[in-house]
Amino acid sequence: MTTYNNKGPKPERGRFLHFHSVTFWVGNAKQAASFYCNKMGFEPLAYRGLETGSREVVSHVIKQGKIVFVLCSALNPWNKEMGDHLVKHGDGVKDIAFEVEDCDHIVQKARERGAKIVREPWVEQDKFGKVKFAVLQTYGDTTHTLVEKINYTGRFLPGFEAPTYKDTLLPKLPRCNLEIIDHIVGNQPDQEMQSASEWYLKNLQFHRFWSVDDTQVHTEYSSLRSIVVTNYEESIKMPINEPAPGRKKSQIQEYVDYNGGAGVQHIALKTEDIITAIRHLRERGTEFLAAPSSYYKLLRENLKSAKIQVKESMDVLEELHILVDYDEKGYLLQIFTKPMQDRPTLFLEVIQRHNHQGFGAGNFNSLFKAFEEEQALRGNLTDLEPNGVRSGM
C-alpha cells in the first residue's frame, strides 16, 4: 500500500468542488428510483419527463443527505444510444457529475491535453437561475458532466420539477442517514488501470492519492491492483481497479465480463453512524456481503496490540458483518451490498471514517473471499489458463 503526498502544482483556475450527482441508465427509471428509495433510504427530489416537456428521456432524481442519484430511461423505442447501452452494460452508472468553478477553463485545458469532449460547454436556465454544463469522456462508456451553477437556486437543475407523487410508505421506514459520496470506483480490463488513472492526472490535473498491487491484495485464487486519483482539494476520490492474473477469475474480471468492459463498480456512501445505518438498511431489506466469524476472531486478537481503540462494540460489528481497517492514526468501518441488479456489476458501500483516509486495504483479502463465495454461487469462480486467459464465461 502506498500513500502519495505530492499534489503537484495547484491549478491556476477551474476548481473541482465535489461530486454533484451520479446518473444511471436503466430499463425502468420509475421502478429503479423506487428501489433505491425503499431499500437504501433515498427520497424523491425532482422529475423530468413527458409531463414537463421531455419527449425522449425520463429522469427520476432521488436524494439522501448530499448524495444525488439520477435514474434515466428512454421513452421511445427508437432511442438507439440508450438501447444499445442497456443491452451491452445492463442497468448501471452512465455519468459521474462534478460541481466545478470555471467550467470553460477546465474544458479548454482538458481539450489541450487530448481529452475527448463529448459536448462543449452550454448553458441552461429557468426562473431559478443559470447552470453551465460540459461533458467529457472517461473510461469505457462512462462520462463526466461538469456542472457550474451561476447563482442557481432551484431544487436540482433547470428543466426539472418537484415530484408530483409522494410514496406514503417512505416516511414509515427507518432513516439511514447516509450523508455524502465518499468515493466512486471504476473497474478496468487487465492492463488498462494505468491509462485510465493517467487520464485524470493528465486531463483534469488530479493527482495520485493511494495505491495497492497484487502482491498486497490476493487470495488463493485471484488478486487486484488499484490506484486512487483525486482533485487538488481531495474532495473527489476515484479508485481505479484492474484484475491481476490468478488461478481463477477475479471479481474484477467478473465485473468486466458482465459489464461489457470498463465501468463503475461501486459507489461508497459515507455516514457518521454506520451501526444505525446498517441496522436500518437491513430492516429495509438491503442485502450485504457477510464476513466470516474467523475475520472477527483475528481482528480482536490484532487490536489488542494496536495503537488505536475501536469505539464501537466488536460484538455489534460482528453481528452486522461490518469490517474494520486501521493504522496507527485511526480506523474505518465499511460494509458492501450485494449487486444492486441481476448482473453482478454495480454495488454500494457504506463507510464511516475515524481519522483514517484509506480504502480498506486490510480488508481486501477478506472481501475477496466473500466475493469469491458469491461468484461460486453464480458459477463464475472459473479456472484461468496458465497465460491468464479465461477458460469460459
Curated annotation (Swiss-Prot):
Keywords: Acetylation, Cytoplasm, Dioxygenase, Endoplasmic reticulum, Golgi apparatus, Iron, Membrane, Metal-binding, Oxidoreductase, Phenylalanine catabolism, Phosphoprotein, Repeat, Tyrosine catabolism. Its EC number is 1.13.11.27. It is a peripheral membrane protein. Fe cation binds at H183, H266, E349. It is an enzyme of class 1 (oxidoreductase). It catalyses: 3-(4-hydroxyphenyl)pyruvate + O2 = homogentisate + CO2. GO terms for cellular component: endoplasmic reticulum; endoplasmic reticulum membrane; Golgi apparatus; Golgi membrane. Pathway: Amino-acid degradation; L-phenylalanine degradation; acetoacetate and fumarate from L-phenylalanine: step 3/6. Binds 1 Fe cation per subunit. It is found in: Cytoplasm; Endoplasmic reticulum membrane; Golgi apparatus membrane. GO terms for biological process: L-phenylalanine catabolic process; tyrosine catabolic process. One of its GO terms (molecular function) is protein homodimerization activity. Residues 18-149, 180-338 form the VOC domain. NCBIfam families: 4HPPD (TIGR01263). Homodimer. Belongs to the 4HPPD family. It is linked to Defects in Hpd are the cause of tyrosinemia type III. This is 4-hydroxyphenylpyruvate dioxygenase. It comes from Mus musculus.
